[in-house]
Every structure is written in C-alpha cells, then in structure tokens.
Amino acid sequence: VATQTVLDAVRAAPTLLEAIRAADALTIAAVSDGGGRAVRLLTRAALDPSDQLTAIAAVHSLAQVFDEEADLALLRLLADERAFLREHAAWAFGGRLPRPAAVGPLLRMLRDGGFAGMLAQRTLLLWASSTPDLVALALEGALIGERDRDVRARYVETMGLVPGAIAERTLLHVAADEGEVFEARAAAADALGERPSDDAALMLARLGEMPEPLGPVARVALADRAIAPVADAGPTVAQLFVHADIDGTLTRVGAGDNGGIATLLVRLGDALTEEEGIDRVLTLSRGTWAEAERALADLPAAGHGFAPVPFVGAAVPMPQAWPRRTAAERGIRRILRAAGRVDVLHLRMADVGSLAAAAVARELEIPVVFTVAPDPHALIAGLDASGALSRADFGDRDAVEHFWFRVRLVQRLAADAAHTVLFPRAELAETMRDMLGIDITAHPERHSIVPEGIDVRLVERGEQAARAAAAGEDVALDAGDDLSALDALLAELPAERRGLPLLLSVGRLHRVKGMATLAEAWAGSPLRDRANLLLVGGDLDAPTPDETEQLDRIRTVAADGLLLAGHRPNGTVARWLGAVRHGRPGFAAAGGAYVCASVKEEFGIALLEALAAGLPVVAPATGGPATYVEEGVTGFLVDTTDHEALAVAACLALDLAAGPLAEFSADRGRTMVLERYTIEAMASALSGVYVRATADQEWPLRCDLVLGAS
C-alpha cells in the first residue's frame, strides 16, 4: 500500500526535480512493503511509456526489493528496447546478488561502450568481488573471436579488476601477445601493476624495456607495484580536473575542455602555497603515459606540482569521458599514493574525475571538500519550466545527458564531503534547498561560501601594456608579440571596418558557452554595424565534436567583422582585454566591450578578468554573475538564449564604453574585483576550509594528517 501511495506522489510531483527527490521515498516504501504486490506495481510503473521519470524511479526501487520476481523484472528491463531502461537496470543490478542470466546482457552493454558500458562494467565488477570466476570466464569467452580493438580493450580493462587466477592468466597472455592490439595490451599491463605475483612483475619488467607506446605504460604500472612515497612532504592539498592538459603556463586554455577551470586551478594552486599551513598543492589533470612516468619520479615535496592521469587513446570531450572511470581511478590512486601525504582532496564537479577520485579518497581515507553547484539541476529545472523536457521524454533525454546519474552523484559527493563550498548567488539557501534538496542552514558550519578569484596583477599588467602600446610607447617584448598577433588577426578585416571597436568573448567552443549563439545574435542585428566580434577559444586545427558543432554554426553566419582566434594563453588574453578597451591604432577603435553568452555560468572567471581590465560586460542573468555585475554601471545582465536581448545588451555595453561614464564604470569594476575576487582572497578562504575539513572528521585521523600539524 505504501508503494502505491508513494508512486502516486512521484507521479504528482509538480516539478521534475521534486519527482527525482521523491524517488528515495519510493525505495523506502518498496523495501518496507516487499513481496509480489510491490514488485508488480513497480514493474508496471517501469514499463509505463507515458512517464519515463517515474519508470526510472521504479527501476531503482525494484533493485532494493529482494524477491525472485524483482530479479526477473530487472532481467526483462535489461533486455528492453528502450535504452534508458536498459541503462538503469544495469545500474540497479549492481545492488543485488550476482545473477548469471544477467551477465550476458551486461557484457553486450560493455561491448557497446559509452555511458551504459560504464554502468555495466561497474555492476560486473561489484559481482566479481563475490563470484570472480563467473565474471572472469564470461569475459574470457567474450574475448574469443572479438576483433574490435576498443572492445577488446574494454574487456581486458574489466578483467584487470577481477580477482583470481583466471583473470591474471588472461592478463598475462594478452600483455605478452605481440599480435594483440596495443589498446588491449596497455590495459593488461596497467592492470598487472596491481597484481602482487612474481609473474606480473616479470612481465612488466619485460614490457618496460620496450619503446613507446607500450613501454611507458608498463613502467608506470611497475611504479604502481613499488610506490616510493615522497618523503618529508608538508601539508598537502590535491585538486583535479581530468579533462584538460594543465600545466603552469596554461598554454592550452580554451581548447577542448581546457576552460576557466584550468586557469583557476593553476592560479589557485600557486596562491595556496603562499598560505600559512599549506606547503604543497598537487594539481591532477590529463596527460600522456610518458608524462605520468616522469611526474611520478619528480613529485615535489613542496610548492605547486602537476601530475598527469594517463589514458589510452585520444582525448575525448567531458560528456563522453564516463567510460574512463577505471583508468581515472587507477591513475588518481597512483598519484595520491606516490605523493606520500595528502591532507585534503578538493573536488569541483559531478564528472568522471570526481566519481573516480571520491572512490580513491574513501579507500585512502583522505577528507574531501566538494564545491556544490546546481548542475545539472538548473538545466533540468530550466528545461522543465520551458516545456522542453517532460516526464514523457525524460528517459530518452537521460540516455544522452545522464541527468539521473549526475543528480545522484552530486547528492553522494555532497553527503560524503567533510565540507562543502558554495558559490555566492542570489537566494543561495533557497536555490540549494529547492534544486538540490540541501538545507545549508541546518548545519552552517559544514558549508562555506567562497567566491572564485583571478590573478588581478596579470590582468593589470596586460591592460597597462595595451594602454602604453595604444599611446605609441614601447612595451616589453612578450607583450609586443601578443599585441602584434592581435594586429595580424585584425588585418584580415576590410579597411572600412577597422575603425570599429571590438566585442570580445573568451571561452571554450561548446554549446553551454554560447559562442555560436553570440555570433548569430551579432550577425543578425544592427550590432554588426557597431562593432567587430572576436571569439577566442577552441582548437581550430583539430576541433573536438563539440567544437565542430559550434564552428559549423558560426561559419553559417560568418560575415566580415567576425574573427576566430582559437585558444590563446592566459597572458595573451590579458593583453587582448586591454587592447579591446584602448584600441589598436589602425586596426580597432577604443571603447570595446566583453560579452559572455553562456547558457549558465556558475561564477565566471573570464567575466571577472574583463571587469578587472576595465571593460563593461554582458553576462547571464542567472548564476554567479548576478552577484557582481552592477546593472547599467559595470555591465548588463540578460537572458543569453534570446538573440535580440543579447544584441541589445551588447549595444548598451558599447554605449557605456564610449560614453561619459566609461572611466567611472571601469574604475567601479576594477575596484570591485580587487576588493572581493582576487585569487589571494580565494586561497585565504579555502585554506580555512581545508583546516576545518581535516579537523572535523568522524573517523580518527593520524595527527600528521591534520593540516598544519607538525
């Protein structure tokens, strides 16, 4: 009876987010009722095509009813023609006892790869802990006759986490086979690094003598077997973003997924090492096996170090990276073990890196700080409110966007964190309660509001160089080179457009960042007659699928005055911000503005840099920018999905930049950033968070793991 009542409540929930949260009550009711009636009610709900959201909730509730009928229902769902039901059944089976009849369907999902393959792999590995031979023999059979190199690699990677002699025998065979594809041999070698046997050690030693590409993989795996932790390391903070190639020079910012988060982690890591009580920061990101090998040998005992997590194969966009969970977990574990001392791990988003890192942190008993943001909650709420997403198609969209999994991941990360960090935003407490179901007023000591920060000095130097160059004064060689590179781009403009100011937007070429939307708004309005548009970001030579989608849209509306600069280093962007304000003699007029057309912006590093450079800005009306953009004074807040509104706001920003209040606006923006949003202020606030996170653990910590302890 309770199951029926709560099912009705899930179906009647006024919003999609409220229905998702009500799913927990459905599981409790189903477990309480138990028996065939509850199973039949849930099965009917799972198969109801009119309410795909309730169907997903029913699948996960079924998994908690330990009844033979529930197993049979989940088996049926595992073979359903609808992808979202198969995915959630595969996920749900992980909470049940091993079911031999489900192994075949799960292997087929693993073969197909993608997000569903990751879920299937997870369930198979959960079962392998109690029935290793069942899973190992199934994988061994699947390898026979399989020719697809990526599929073979997935099977071998999965086998690598199955305990027992059967799995190790297969790994040794694959690693030794010179006729085997590289991807599978690499997966076998990587897994052998976690096997204690002498045979595994001998195999890795042999493979380690080989050149690239297999040699570095084997040598890194060998290092796994004999980790020599860094001695004498002081209090250490680890942070990560595994979708970017992050180095101290930020040479790849703006390409692929190397966005504002990469800039933030580099600047923040440098600033944190200046804080009392923090000796070392380790920033983990994507890298090659050769880079990982070098980094393991050279992890610093102090200062800001960079450590790559290696993956086999080319980089993939963040939404497609879920199948790299196993590799991410192994790479993160390797680095944190080699680091010797890690006092706290800071996670910032609900992605595969955080999923993997959280598992490693639990294993190594490292306290976690998690930055909580309403993502994907805000997107779900927006689509729900606009009618673009409903119960009728939630599952189909979920199969692409993984909404349910990401919502649950945020919930789990926030619940497990020793401390959570929040971005400032209007009505923060209400947003956290309504969207995430988190009451930050109940235990305020567990939450801290910490705004992001920027390297103001870098922006100031860039602005000063651009001002001097515009006045005909000499500037430093590197600044001159950057400004000359901008001139070369501007020289492509027709002569009649070289007297116009610039509208600048910096960011990844991704639909969330709205670069194509901005180009369309500019090209289809009088804004095009007012200014040229300069878009900075993306890999123009080897674009990712997301970048290609944006470039195709941009090129559809391309016209004289639109310039694509590709990704540029952070220092270059700082000088170009100054050039937008002060102009480039013979190429661009002074009095430009900055436009952020992001669909959502939790805070906005690039916006803060533009304000610090004295530019008026256009920014999304929702999220973080609303807390620092002063409407009509330092910029304009707008619905960035509305082309007309975006163009009008950009025109107003140009009016402000050229009007009598231009200097007042610039000073106001700069002062605001200096007072509230420096990277040093952010580091100071976070250092206090880290102290609290390591001091207030429920489990005992060794005294030398408490941040700041001697």
Tell me what each language-model feature is.
Residues 2-46, 50-54, 63-74, 80-83, ...:
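Catalytic cores of nucleotide-sugar-dependent glycosyltransferases that transfer UDP/GDP/TDP-activated
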Residues 56, 87, 118-124:
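Sequence termini and other peripheral, non-core segments
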